[in-house]
Amino acid sequence: MPPRRDLKKILIIGSGPITIGQAAEFDYSGTQAVKALRGAGYRVVLVNSNPATIMTDPELAERTYIEPLDLEHLEGILAREAPDALLPTLGGQTGLNLAMALYEEGILQKYGVELIGAKAEAIRKGEDREAFQEAMRRIDLEVPRGQLVGSVEEGLHFAREVGFPVVVRPSFTLGGTGGGIAHDEAELVEVLSRGLTLSPVHTALVEESVLGWKEFELEVMRDHADTVVIITSIENVDPMGVHTGDSITVAPAQTLSDVEYQRMRDAAKAIIREIGVETGGSNIQFAVDPKTGRQVVIEMNPRVSRSSALASKATGFPIAKIAALLAVGYRLDELPNDITRKTPASFEPTIDYVVVKIPRFAFEKFRPLRNTLGELKDELTTQMKSVGEVMAIGRTFKEALMKALRGLERDVRALAGVRTEELEKKLYPNPDRVYAVMELLRRGMPVEELYQATRIDPWFLHQMKEIVEAEEWLKTHPPKDREDWRFYKGLGLTDRRIGELLGKGEKEVRAERKALGVVPVYKTVDTCAAEFEAYTPYHYSTYELEDEVWPSQKPKVVILGSGPIRIGQGVEFDYATVHAVWALKEAGFETIMVNSNPETVSTDYDTADRLYFEPLTLEDVLNIVEHEKPIGVIATLGGQTPLKLAKGLEEAGVRLLGTPFSAIHQAEDREAFHALCQRLGIPQPEGRVAQSPEEALRLAPEVGFPLLVRPSYVLGGRAMQVVRDEGELKRYLEEVYAPLEERPSILLDRFLEGAIELDVDALSDGQEVMVAGIMEHVERAGVHSGDSATLLPPVHVPEEALKKVRDYTRRLALTLGVRGLLNVQYAVVGEEVYVLEANPRASRTVPFVSKAIGVPLAKLAALIAVGKTLKELGVRDLDPVPPYYAAKEVVIPWIKFPGVIPELGPEMRSTGESMGIDQDPYLAYYKAELGAGQRLPLSGQVRFIGEGLEDLKALYQEAGFALTEGQDYDLLISLVPDPELRRAVERGLPFITTREGAWWSLKAILRARESGLRVQSLQDWHQKAPRG
């Protein structure tokens, strides 16, 4: 069937800021779909409020709108662009809910826009819990007994009938938001009231519990001709009761019998047909009772999902790309498989390896905060809480598991020092469970006992036991020949771990292994278990005999990715590495990407010339460098993860491209940087470095309180705090510093109260420096720069101070010898400027600044790293200032951490960001707020909590707002961590926790009242910017 030529222009809705449950996987799938549709001759309009994405690059879609994802702005875009169709299945839950709202409000019909990929009825059947259960009954498939309820009373009535525990699943929410498990009536009242509030349609499914059952997923695709293919099966290592996004998962499924698998496949095909997903992909989840084999259907996502990104990376089958092409009328048998070029997309992938995904969490960021429910528990439930994930590929489950664990950048023996009885308490679902299980296996706990405590299938527990037994044997039987070495390395044991077991250093073990010629070989991900030749170089390491990867003789560059997304190191760094790959490819280099994150564009098989899906450890990276022999490695674009490898790589004789390691070290080493600033005459706040808690207490009075204290070498403000007296400092040293594994030195800085903070991104070639963007923070000093709203260009900083900022930035860049990007943070008090820190690497603001000024900074940085100058790259304007304002606001997933009271401080907690652009700074800020989900009211009631707020109250009253002391408000302003803030979070109401935020918000509200709505594409904004 030829593609539809009646459609010319297609609108794609992105998923908005990155948050828990909706991360970089939608940037990956959206980017793939835009490229596919444009390649097929369609015009594509994209709307997304998230600037930190590849999909919002102005070169990708024909028209790109960085606008809030709400009905008003979308209607404005529909009116302006007049697309023929809307593809709603690529923007996660946000995109799907918006598409449904546009349809239900009659807005799509008004502008004659057709929904393609999934019709409204199919979305409703897949997403509405009751409709889905009815559909399953029609095709004789079992679902857990459940009832859709609209009130707590109905829920209690049903739970009394089926018995506790019950599971609560709110309708149309993301990552299980608002859901949970209730073990008794009191818990049901709590979970269900929250779930009903958070569901956009205020309903939730209460269903019988299948806790402890095995959980499986199938990724399914269907075309117009009713061809249905199963892309892969995925098995959750953690049993039912843990959200699949928080489970360790493995593909293909390991413990299903052939009969069970065939039954599941038949069910999946029947489901996608019954729900009516005419074209595209769906993810269908099943539970299997391990005792009886009873199989029930849990739910489906009639869209591209987190699991489809994982399935794409696990198999090499580009689900989002194919889904986009099916939506415009192609059939599966008409689309070629990019990897083999011989087989069509209707051939189901076959894989001869095992893939393991492990989630990454951030409980430690939220635990120190006040909580209305007591201490924050790290228990994993049906509500997703992980912020990122790592994927690894091996020939066996054991090898893939161990590679994935080291990809998390955490010691496999993290719990070695914990007492056995404490470990036994860590067997409930929590981020440490896999470490506790392995540690207890080392201490001889039987598999059966572990199974009873965890309900993890005994097959997985036996696999872990075999790893532990091999480690034990190794202690007394060192490897003596190649076979021994290959056996131990094939289990996924690192040189470092083998060294620990034998009492040797990592370098010594590496030398012994290499002397015997034992090095990894590289295999290819080819979708067909080596039945056809693979043309797309997508590789993983293993310790076998046959190598499938032959390095070319071309000049090549290795770019190190950033590993799993976490708070402080988000998709912004993936953006920088992808841009570097594209720029170096255009310049004629062969590009080699090393990364372990399945959610991202960097690990798409067609981003770099070669992709190594490997953990970012020194051992794994050195193996690749020795195999490929590149001209050098770029380690400064992926955040702290690759930066930590820079020293080891340089010591091993690897050439680091761009900024030399000496410059990185000089900027990060506190004393060296202080000496440099003194030499250059650049002021810094008073500060000292202590090597121990005792020294910190002695030096503190010399610097003077209040102090900003933190360990050296951290990202995202980990363990950073403002302390106001000696008592607070003592508490910090005992509660925050003492538990740190590495015991780094302690930095004590004088805290400048009331200063305006600035963030500066610059680009240097060693001779000239481009000061690309100066951003003013809305929140004052003391709030982590990654959690502050920012404006570019600054609004409240005197020109005299800005001149100093440019001058200091240039001097720092040239003296440090930066070749590439540099981020500097300043504090401004009046016209005085103090430098806080400098980081000679890509920062998290690079995508935002690039979008704001229309200059691809990361691309230029990569070309400078291989020897180009700013002049040669055509950069003329070294101080670009756009003739409009760009604002950035952050998103913090407060809702996912029960009871936590929102509070901003020096430790970063945001997961994502939104952007607003306007001629007026306050309107840009208003748009950024809307884009981040903070719907500031234009009128209504405001409640204030805290002392000394008379001036703000007067301003809000003057603007026509009524003040209230009650619960019925439209906006909450609380400058103290009050439990009312938690209630606002759970009711989805806007709230503000800083004086500056309250002031900016009021200015924004006043401007928004006057001006009404304006939408404009990024391409149009860039027309106005002076071309660098």
Swiss-Prot record:
Sequence positions that bind Mg(2+) 2: 299, 301
Region (Carboxyphosphate synthetic domain): 1-409
Region (Allosteric domain): 934-1028
Binding residues for Mn(2+) 2: 299, 301
Protease among keywords: no
Binding positions for Mn(2+) 3 per the UniProt entry: 825, 837
Catalytic activity: hydrogencarbonate + L-glutamine + 2 ATP + H2O = carbamoyl phosphate + L-glutamate + 2 ADP + phosphate + 2 H(+)
Residues where Mg(2+) 1 binds: 285, 299
Subunit structure as annotated in this protein's UniProt entry: Composed of two chains; the small (or glutamine) chain promotes the hydrolysis of glutamine to ammonia, which is used by the large (or ammonia) chain to synthesize carbamoyl phosphate. Tetramer of heterodimers (alpha,beta)4.
Name of this chain's protein: Carbamoyl phosphate synthase large chain
Source species taxonomy: Bacteria, Thermotogati, Deinococcota, Deinococci, Thermales
Gene name of this polypeptide: carB
